[in-house]
Structures are given as structure tokens and as C-alpha cells.
Amino acid sequence: MVLSAADKTNVKGVFSKISGHAEEYGAETLERMFTAYPQTKTYFPHFDLQHGSAQIKAHGKKVVAALVEAVNHIDDIAGALSKLSDLHAQKLRVDPVNFKFLGHCFLVVVAIHHPSALTAEVHASLDKFLCAVGTVLTAKYR
């Protein structure tokens, strides 16, 4: 999915509001995903999955940091996330559908914290971006 110039501007605008809240928003996203899609917990058997867990916060921060990295290299998301793609495809073997679940939960968290920023146009751009990230992360599964 190709991001237009407007999409890139919209995504960068949203992430300028998000990047300072990586741990908080990342943890919220993971907690929401584990609640809405309990099967995703199977990839984290060694984690304390309780609300406020230090492990959830740390991993959530990593998730948002990876998204920020993708935003910072929005014209080369595949290059920016290549190592992460290898990790998820070859070592962790995460079911590709989970990236869609994560993206959806991230959109909800953004909507909760920045409702006025998430216009229909921005929502569509952010969704396209998250789909592009998911596509990159699953590209090496084939």
C-alpha cells in the first residue's frame, strides 16, 4: 500500500503527539490486544500480563519505538524494520493476523488520547501506515 504525501504528513503529525508517550500508549495497546484477542497472550507465556506490569510497559515501549522508527523512515519502512521482520518471521513465528490486531488496538488508543487529532482523513492515513508496517513485518513469512 502506497502512502501519499498527505498520508505521510498525517502520520508524522499524529506521531509527533505520540512519541513522548511510548511506554504508556504501548502498554495500553498491548493490554487492549490481550483483552480483546486473548489468543495473542500465547506469545508471551513468560510475561506478567497484569495491568501495569513492568514487562508489558517495557514491551509496549519497544512496539511504539518500532513504529516511530518506521515513521522516521516512512519512505523505507521495509529497510527500517528488516531486522524486526526477520525476528518475528523466523524466530518468534508470530501469526501474521496479530499485527492487524495490534494495529487496530493502537488506533483505539490513539483515538482515546487524541480524539480531535484523529479526523477521518488522519484515521485513514494512520490505518494505511499500520497496514504497511504489518505487510513489512509479514513479508519474510513467505
Curated annotation (Swiss-Prot):
Ranges for domain Globin: 2-142
Similarity comment: family membership: Belongs to the globin family.
Family annotation (InterPro entries): Globin, Globin-like_sf, Globin/Proto, Hemoglobin_a-typ, Hemoglobin_oxygen_transport, Hemoglobin_pi
The name this protein goes by in its record: Hemoglobin subunit alpha-A
Pfam family, one: Globin
Task of the protein: Involved in oxygen transport from the lung to the various peripheral tissues.
Quaternary structure note: Heterotetramer of two alpha chains and two beta chains.
GO BP field: hydrogen peroxide catabolic process
Expressing tissues: Red blood cells.
Gene Ontology molecular function: haptoglobin binding; heme binding; iron ion binding; organic acid binding; oxygen binding; oxygen carrier activity; peroxidase activity
Keyword entries, A-Z: Heme, Iron, Metal-binding, Oxygen transport, Transport
Keyword Heme recorded: yes
Entry's transmembrane regions: none
SUPFAM superfamilies on file: Globin-like
GO cellular component annotations of the record: blood microparticle; haptoglobin-hemoglobin complex; hemoglobin complex
Gene name of this polypeptide: HBAA
